[in-house]
């Protein structure tokens, strides 16, 4: 069953079968063949169908109705395409390379779990991405960007629209982005965090992309020089030991020269670790993570190392040529002459926890573990070079890289997206801390303009008309406010509509604000008098008037901006207001202008600002995932939290961690009423999300463990192949057989008889 999830349609990808991308995909897909035995995590069979269903955006429904291919036909075709992927990948040319991994007694997942299988269509041939949990790498005060992108990804309607439009190349010629390393491979080890001093906040903890590259290059040059000198000396010592050892006796010196050249090539090809700085732990960040239930991205590598050690010990006992240490741990080969312990790759995380085995890992330790554990998807270039370098295409590449990756968890490095952002808006091209709301507003407007410009290409299916005005950004986020100004002299009323993509929540003085009370019957009244008199077109003069603001149209996704930042005349700068602002999990919104304007919302995401002012601080976000419940995203790390933790960031002078942007998603009134009637619904939902998280972690650990053991087995083969005794035994065996066959021939006359 696991083959269906981790493979590519070999039949449809035949024109590109010789490309490097498909070879890599085939190797990874065939490494997950079903085998019998014990060792895999047991996962309860999900009662769901073969593919989980996700919410369909409002504008998509109209597209699919107009399309001659109905949604059922689309799903059937997608499922057929999906099954062809994973059936055809069972037999590939690279199967021989990973076939030895079946010696480890692993049992594949015999389940139709929604964690592995998601909704697929012709426009989303690799699923809708609802089963992926990825963190975002911070490139230097980019936490404002990471938090907003995480909230948008966890809105199914937004994510599916970005994945579907504009339509990519046909599925026949499309290559799955199973493992995106980028132009510059980002590899993190324990040494990656030793060259710089960690900083306490995100302002000083990172550098810009350009500066970071130069900074990394400087350190890499130093590390390369040190590594080259030490590695050269080590190679010479290894050659001397081999020359004096029994295994190396009688070996030609030219072989050593060839081996040295091979080692130099391997050293050049092996990617050097990236040197970076992660945000140091402090009381503010540790208090934020107090409500953590389960670490998803950033958990230690203990499970992988333990299982790898057990499998390696078993293999060592079965193979006399495999070298083991005193503890029975497996020794694998990195190159021809240097043997290392595979458990050393976990020391970066385990060393930091040696003295805290029974304590919860800090946020700094989790971020280091997440970067080392990987995979790190470095999206540092446009995946389709012929397309325009826009923010929309950059975000689409990020979403596709997450959705199509073979791993369930990991980290994304949005290098190209941040680069495009700094080019599109010079206000973000600085090392200063940026405003998350300003970024969200600019992003949605930029997306809307891009869709309007490319509207004919954004159509669903084969029916593409030029007279269509569909724009899923406006369909999801656009609302309308009505301004009515009544002249108190002639009673003339002037009306004007104002669209909005995010709704402002004003903060007045030291007052407490209740969002539910404010939006239950929303209206604002203001008297226009004195210097603010209104010019009446009927009276032809400035008159006193009354202005009323109400809601005319409500959006599907209601984003609320809590205006905590304001300019202070006394301090001559922007300050942060710590007024208490209450926000509910379910929100009722209506208008006094029109009683028919009414919608019920449920909280979907919260962007949180940590700090005493707008010029500095740190952004994190809390999102409600459709499969895994409430998740806390802190740049590289992701963890599940309790529902009551979501409502704790209301703000007060003693707490600098406050909610800043709220995302509410429209829900059906009947659904909420049924939930109120059924007391056990919330507990059942909580049990389901907890079970999904357990499945996610077990699946992810199993896949990573499988990959490590397959790689270790290949390295073991290389090591055994370089041992002269093994080579001699392999070469002598066929010769002895030939001699025995010749000895059976007693007469040359009858030698033609076999």
Swiss-Prot record:
Keywords: Hydrolase, Protease, Thiol protease, Ubl conjugation pathway. Residues 250-272, 727-738 have a biased composition (Basic and acidic residues). It comes from the Eukaryota. PROSITE patterns: USP_1 (PS00972), USP_2 (PS00973), USP_3 (PS50235). Residues 1-14, 739-748 have a biased composition (Basic residues). Gene3D superfamilies: Cysteine proteinases (3.90.70.10). It holds the Pfam family UCH. One of its GO terms (molecular function) is cysteine-type deubiquitinase activity. The active site is at residues 143, 618. Residues 1-76, 194-273, 726-754 are annotated as: Disordered. Residues 42-58, 222-233 have a biased composition (Low complexity). It is an enzyme of class 3 (hydrolase). It catalyses: Thiol-dependent hydrolysis of ester, thioester, amide, peptide and isopeptide bonds formed by the C-terminal Gly of ubiquitin (a 76-residue protein attached to proteins as an intracellular targeting signal). Residues 194-209 have a biased composition (Polar residues). Residues 134-667 form the USP domain. One of its GO terms (biological process) is protein deubiquitination. GO terms for cellular component: cytoplasm; cytosol; nucleus. Its EC number is 3.4.19.12. Belongs to the peptidase C19 family. Present with 98 molecules/cell in log phase SD medium. This is Ubiquitin carboxyl-terminal hydrolase 9. It comes from Saccharomyces cerevisiae (strain ATCC 204508 / S288c) (Baker's yeast).
């Amino acid at each position: 069953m696991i083959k269906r999830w981790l493979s590519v349609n070999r039949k449809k990808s035949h024109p590109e079968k010789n490309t490097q991308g498909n070879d890599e995909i085939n190797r990874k897909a065939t490494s997950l063949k079903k085998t019998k035995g014990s060792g895999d995590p047991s996962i309860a069979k999900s009662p769901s169908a073969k593919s989980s269903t996700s919410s369909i955006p409002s504008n998509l429904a109209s597209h699919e109705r107009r399309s001659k291919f109905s949604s059922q036909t689309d799903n059937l075709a997608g499922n057929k395409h999906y099954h062809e992927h994973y059936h055809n990948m069972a037999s590939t040319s690279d199967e021989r390379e990973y076939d030895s991994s079946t010696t480890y007694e692993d049992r594949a997942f015999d389940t139709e779990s929604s964690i592995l299988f998601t909704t697929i269509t012709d426009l989303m041939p690799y699923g809708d991405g609802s089963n992926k949990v990825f963190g975002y790498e911070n490139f230097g005060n980019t936490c404002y960007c990471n938090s907003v992108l995480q909230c948008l990804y966890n809105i199914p309607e937004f994510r599916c629209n970005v994945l579907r439009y504009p339509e990519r190349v046909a599925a026949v010629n499309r290559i799955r982005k199973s493992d995106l390393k980028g132009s510059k491979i980002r590899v993190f080890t324990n040494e990656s965090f030793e060259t710089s001093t960690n900083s306490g906040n995100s302002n000083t903890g990172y550098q810009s992309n350009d500066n970071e590259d130069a900074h990394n290059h400087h350190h890499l040059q130093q590390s390369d020089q040190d590594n080259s000198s030490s590695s050269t000396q080590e190679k010479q010592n290894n050659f001397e030991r081999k020359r004096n050892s029994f295994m190396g006796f009688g070996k030609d010196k030219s072989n050593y020269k060839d081996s040295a050249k091979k080692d130099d090539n391997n050293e050049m090809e092996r990617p050097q670790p990236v040197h970076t700085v992660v945000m140091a732990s402090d009381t503010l960040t540790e208090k934020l993570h107090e409500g953590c239930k389960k670490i998803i991205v950033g958990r230690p590598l203990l499970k992988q190392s333990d299982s790898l050690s057990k499998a390696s010990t078993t293999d060592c006992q079965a193979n006399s040529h495999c070298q083991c240490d005193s503890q029975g741990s497996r020794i694998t080969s990195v190159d021809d002459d240097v043997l290392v312990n595979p458990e050393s790759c976990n020391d970066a995380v385990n060393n930091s926890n040696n003295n805290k085995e029974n304590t919860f890992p800090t946020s700094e330790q989790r971020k280091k573990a997440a970067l080392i554990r990987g995979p790190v998807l470095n999206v540092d270039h446009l995946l389709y070079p012929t397309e325009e370098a826009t923010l929309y295409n950059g975000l689409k590449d990020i979403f596709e890289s997450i959705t199509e990756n073979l791993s369930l968890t990991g980290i994304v490095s949005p290098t190209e997206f941040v680069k495009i952002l700094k080019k599109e808006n010079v206000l973000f091209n600085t090392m200063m801390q940026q405003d998350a709301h300003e970024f969200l507003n600019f992003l949605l407007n930029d997306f809307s303009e891009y869709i309007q410009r490319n509207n004919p290409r954004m159509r669903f299916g084969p029916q593409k008309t030029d007279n269509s005005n569909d724009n899923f950004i406006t369909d999801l986020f656009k609302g309308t406010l009505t301004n009515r100004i009544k002249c108190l002299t002639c009673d003339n009323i002037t009306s004007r509509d104002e669209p909005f993509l995010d709704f402002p929540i004003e903060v007045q003085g030291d007052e407490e604000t209740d969002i539910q009370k404010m939006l239950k019957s929303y209206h604002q009244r203001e008297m226009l008098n004195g210097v603010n008199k209104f010019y009446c077109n009927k009276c032809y003069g400035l008159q006193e008037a009354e202005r009323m603001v109400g809601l005319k149209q409500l959006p599907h996704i209601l984003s609320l901006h809590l205006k905590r930042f304001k300019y202070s005349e006394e301090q001559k700068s922007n300050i942060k207001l710590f007024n208490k602002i209450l926000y509910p999990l379910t929100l009722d919104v209506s208008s006094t202008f029109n009683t028919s304007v009414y919608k019920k919302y449920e909280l979907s995401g919260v962007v949180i600002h940590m700090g005493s002012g707008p010029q500095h601080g740190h952004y994190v976000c809390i999102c409600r995932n459709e499969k895994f419940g409430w998740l806390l995203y802190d740049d590289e790390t992701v963890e599940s939290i309790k529902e009551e933790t979501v409502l704790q960031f209301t703000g007060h002078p003693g707490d600098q961690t406050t909610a800043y942007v709220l995302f509410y998603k429209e829900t059906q009134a009947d659904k909420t009423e049924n939930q109120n009637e059924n007391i056990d619904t919330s507990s059942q939902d909580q049990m389901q999300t907890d079970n999904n998280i357990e499945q996610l972690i077990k699946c992810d650990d199993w896949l990573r463990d499988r990959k490590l053991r397959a790689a270790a087995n290949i390295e073991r083969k290389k090591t055994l192949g370089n041992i002269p005794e093994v080579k001699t035994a392999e070469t002598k065996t066929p010769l002895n057989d030939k001699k025995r066959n010749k000895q059976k021939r007693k007469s040359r006359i009858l030698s033609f008889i076999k």
